[in-house]
């Protein structure tokens, strides 16, 4: 996928802070997703032959998801604007099951927690695949990178 491009990876991810903060649980998910994303990712803007490493700023504007990509030194690489419409249902469903999961871990039986978690993971996978498909032809990412990016899309959506 990105074997011919040097340093096809992210070294920094920033979320639009103008949207504000969310619940402590959501902020924890954000922090973990960013940490994991920076630790291990495969990220290459299609058509960029210079390679990375890259910085990514994710933001929302008028129901659109904006990927602003620069090199590590700040030089602009690309900006991609995606409609949130294809992700809206899965984000909404994921948020509902996410809330159920966090309520369950405080009081439910282990089997109920496991069942909810399986549903949560399934929706997360669906959202990750949808995001990866939406990025096709714009940004090449592997599945694990798409999963972490989907978490951040959810965080932005929950804040906004």
Curated annotation (Swiss-Prot):
InterPro entries: UCP032146 (IPR008321). Coiled coil: none annotated. It comes from Brucella suis (strain ATCC 23445 / NCTC 10510). This is UPF0262 protein BSUIS_A0274. Belongs to the UPF0262 family.
